[in-house]
């Protein structure tokens, strides 16, 4: 089946980062019930709450599941500026997003 005893290990090493990324993303979707954090439509992507070009990281508490429409509309705008102007804005969802991002800060110093 394999040409050498090391080949299965090489395949595992190649697959591990991809699988880890998939599981990482899946956990975030699961925590948000696969719904957009902004409008609660089905989520199809992850948005950087603090955009990458504004020093936003790709850690789990800076990533928010969102629908394509919200991700494209927000683009690289700061979440606080963009979200409050949306017709679907709710303070409850804003509080949930803010709480999510603060968990990341707590995790850093725990």
Regions found by a protein language model. Give the residues of each.
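Generic anion/oxyanion-binding catalytic loop in active/binding sites
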Residues: 25, 52, 71
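Histidine-centered nuclease catalytic patch
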Residues: 35-65, 74-84
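A detector for short metal-coordination/catalytic motifs
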Residues: 61-62, 72-110
């Amino acid at each position: 089946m394999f040409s050498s005893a090391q080949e299965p290990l090489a395949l595992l090493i190649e697959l591990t980062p991809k699988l880890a990324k998939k599981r990482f993303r899946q956990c975030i979707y699961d925590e948000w019930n696969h719904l957009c954090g902004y409008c609660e439509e089905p989520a199809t992507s992850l948005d950087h709450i603090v955009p990458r070009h504004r020093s936003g990281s790709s850690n789990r508490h800076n990533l928010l599941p969102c629908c394509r429409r919200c991700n494209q509309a927000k683009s690289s705008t700061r979440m606080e500026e963009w979200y409050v102007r949306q017709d679907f804005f709710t303070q409850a969802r804003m509080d949930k997003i803010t709480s999510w991002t603060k968990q990341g800060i707590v995790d850093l110093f725990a």
